[in-house]
Amino acid sequence: GINKDAIITVEPNKKYMVQGIKFETIPAYNINKTFHPKENDWVGYVIELNDIRYYIAGDTDITEENKRVKCDVAFVPVGGTYTMDFKEAAQLINEMQPKVAVPIHYGSIVGTKQDAEEFIKLLNQNIKGTILMR
């Protein structure tokens, strides 16, 4: 487990190292919705493990900050309503150009497995789409 003395409060646009794990925070917010305002300072994460960079977007739309993320694997919401939808998520991924993209945030509150499947179809051919939630 993680030593509770290592638990920290994070802020957007910062780099951290906790118990040897490097990560940075990327602002996560809505552009044209009120659910996740930028002022709340909520974040997604880029975590580096074994020289592989993983981006976990969190609840967000396409933003100037996440368009600049450099990563190998990206986990992005596709459910719409509270976050970007599958078309917007594919647009973001095609701009970011990770090696692998994984759709998240669908199938329970909003979004469907079909959203995840449609997301995969919209990815550039050089990006591998992977559905983890069946």
Predicted regions and their residues:
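Helix-loop-beta element that forms the nucleotide-linked donor phosphate-binding surface
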Residues: 1-9
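Core dinuclear metal-dependent hydrolase active-site scaffold
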Residues: 9-70, 84, 134
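Short, Lys/Arg-enriched charge-dense amphipathic segments
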Residues: 31-37, 81, 103, 128-129
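Metallo-beta-lactamase
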Residues: 46-111
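A structural micro-motif
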Residues: 5, 21, 52, 71, ...
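Residues at alpha-helix termini
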Residues: 1-2, 19, 96
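Binuclear metal-ion centers of metallo-dependent hydrolases, dominated by the metallo-beta-lactamase
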Residues: 8-15, 90, 94-134
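Short, glycine/charged-enriched secondary-structure capping and boundary segments
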Residues: 2, 38-40, 69-72, 88-92, ...
